[in-house]
């Protein structure tokens, strides 16, 4: 497929707000695409690079290059060239990348150049494109949309399912099953303002401790154990304690969902930064394990003895979990019969906070496991308002922060796929955080205008705030009150950041 075709469709999709039109455009594109093009086409349309960060800044992309008069670049050719750019390292790498990018831009038409610049700077972003692409694939291939969605959920990759569908037709979907050793995207929770609100919405439910650790998915098949993060990265070698714990469990073949935590000598949780550092340590795992020992806490079972449990109600999944996992390795919880039993939920929340944990997750007892989705049957409650936002820009600091990128411009996901700025903050940052974020944001920089450095919207940061107030200064019409940085969430992607819609729904007093 020619890049020009993709660039034109991307422009048309961005220009229409009608979901049906977006689906039709993508369906037509997929019908014309070769199966081997799709693993490139889908991330390009969503504004993602399969290669990840390439170290290409605005200075390289801003150099004027005479465009080609006729389109000749294919998407696979572009992908290969960008892979080559990313492979340039060492002395003179900047010049080498600049030369390769110049050659690529010279082979691109003006429309293709604009698309490539947007792709490389993070400006090509389509709202909820993966969900629309599922519908487009279904329409293009004649497969039921629900079957395509389930296959994507089980494969953990839209590109993998799309390639199989286009190569083999709807029958290929039968090959996507929940399989030990192949991770699936985890179910996520929406936010509720209080325990009473959550119990009122869900009725009979389980109120579980919300642990401030790293989400893990544990797979065991006999003596073989694999451990995956929420982004499906394999971290088995970094967590020998979890492998040992898995081999002690009663079952022989299962998939469990849980959290990795670390406790201090008093049994209270250690900081998220310590746990993240431990899980991220690849060099001396033994030393890291001695310094920050971790343990698993499980809260769901997805598969047991080859039996897919995803569609079963939570009560049945938890019964299977309890059969396999001893109580000390299961998350603490309280069963609540409904709103009339709200006092029990409030008591459990207070006890959870007293134990040093960050809140609770309230789960409907009759709900299935919605892998890869933020299900309405899971509601998290934290006493402090927090949001996962995306850093859009940062400002060079003054005084003791001279030379450091300090004041963060914060954005939430808007309905059209862009990021709506909600305000700025320089509060809550330690010296170590300032040093780290300056280095990280410099890598993401795409433009510098005076003291403001615009960055690719890739870095997620957890922000605490005291509330919302109306503001005509920002596109969503609101801004955060007393926003401060809690921590960076490199374990989350921008697609997992909070939305403007969710934020406004959580503060009806401001939007009335």
Curated annotation (Swiss-Prot):
CC cofactor: Mg(2+)
Coiled coil: none
Domain of life: Bacteria
Upper classification of the organism: Bacteria, Bacillati, Actinomycetota, Actinomycetes, Kitasatosporales
GO MF term (any one): DNA ligase (ATP) activity
Catalysed reaction, written as an equation: ATP + (deoxyribonucleotide)n-3'-hydroxyl + 5'-phospho-(deoxyribonucleotide)m = (deoxyribonucleotide)n+m + AMP + diphosphate
Enzyme Commission code: 6.5.1.1
UniProt entry tagged with the keyword Flavoprotein: no
Binding of ATP, residues: 208, 215, 230, 259, 299, 374, 380
This protein's encoding gene: lig
HAMAP family per record: DNA_ligase
Key words, A-Z: ATP-binding, Cell cycle, Cell division, DNA damage, DNA recombination, DNA repair, DNA replication, Ligase, Magnesium, Metal-binding, Nucleotide-binding
Protein name as annotated: Probable DNA ligase
Organism listed in the record: Streptomyces avermitilis (strain ATCC 31267 / DSM 46492 / JCM 5070 / NBRC 14893 / NCIMB 12804 / NRRL 8165 / MA-4680)
């Amino acid at each position: 497929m020619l890049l020009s075709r993709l660039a034109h469709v991307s422009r048309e999709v961005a220009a229409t707000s009608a979901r049906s039109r977006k689906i039709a455009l993508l369906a037509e594109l997929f019908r014309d695409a070769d199966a081997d093009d799709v693993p490139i086409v889908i991330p390009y349309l969503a504004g993602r690079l399969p290669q990840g960060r390439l170290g290409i800044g605005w200075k390289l992309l801003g150099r004027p290059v005479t465009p080609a008069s006729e389109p000749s670049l294919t998407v696979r050719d572009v992908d290969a060239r960008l892979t080559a750019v990313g492979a340039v390292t060492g002395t003179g790498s900047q010049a080498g990348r600049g030369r390769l990018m110049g050659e690529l831009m010279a082979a691109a038409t003006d429309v293709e150049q604009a698309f490539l610049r947007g792709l490389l700077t993070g400006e090509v972003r389509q709202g909820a494109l993966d969900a629309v692409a599922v519908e487009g694939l279904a329409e293009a291939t004649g497969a039921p949309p629900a079957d395509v969605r389930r296959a994507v959920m089980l494969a953990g990759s839209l590109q993998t399912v799309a390639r199989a569908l286009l190569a083999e037709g709807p029958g290929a979907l039968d090959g996507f099953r929940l399989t030990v050793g192949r991770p699936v995207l985890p179910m996520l929770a929406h936010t509720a303002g209080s325990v009473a609100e959550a119990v009122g919405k869900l009725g009979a439910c389980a109120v579980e401790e919300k642990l401030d650790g790293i989400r893990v998915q544990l797979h065991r098949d006999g003596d073989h154990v694999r451990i995956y993060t929420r982004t499906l990265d394999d971290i088995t070698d970094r967590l020998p304690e979890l492998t040992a714990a898995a081999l002690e469990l009663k079952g022989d073949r299962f998939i469990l969902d849980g959290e990795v935590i670390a406790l201090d000598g008093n049994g209270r949780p250690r900081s998220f930064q310590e746990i993240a550092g431990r899980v991220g340590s690849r060099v001396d795992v033994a030393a890291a394990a001695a310094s920050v020992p971790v343990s698993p806490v499980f809260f769901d079972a997805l598969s047991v003895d080859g039996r897919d449990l995803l569609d079963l109600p939570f009560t049945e999944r938890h019964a299977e979990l309890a059969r396999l996992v001893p109580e000390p390795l299961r998350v603490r919880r309280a069963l609540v019969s409904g709103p009339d039993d709200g006092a029990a939920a409030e008591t459990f929340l207070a006890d959870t906070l007293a134990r040093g944990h960050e809140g609770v997750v309230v789960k409907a007892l009759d709900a299935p496991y919605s892998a890869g989705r933020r299900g309405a049957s899971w509601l998290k409650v934290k006493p402090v308002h927090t949001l996962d936002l995306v850093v859009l820009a940062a400002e060079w600091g003054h005084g003791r922060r001279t030379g450091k990128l300090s004041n963060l411009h914060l954005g939430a996901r808007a309905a059209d796929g862009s990021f709506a700025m909600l305000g700025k903050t320089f509060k809550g940052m330690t010296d170590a955080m300032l040093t780290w974020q300056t280095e990280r944001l410099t890598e993401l920089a795409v433009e510098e205008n005076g003291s403001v450095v615009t960055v690719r919207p890739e870095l997620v940061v957890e922000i605490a705030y005291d509330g919302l107030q109306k503001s005509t200064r920002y596109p969503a019409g609101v801004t955060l009150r007393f926003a401060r940085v809690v921590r960076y969430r490199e374990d989350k992607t921008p697609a997992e950041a909070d939305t403007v819609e969710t934020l406004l729904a959580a503060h009806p007093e401001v939007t009335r």
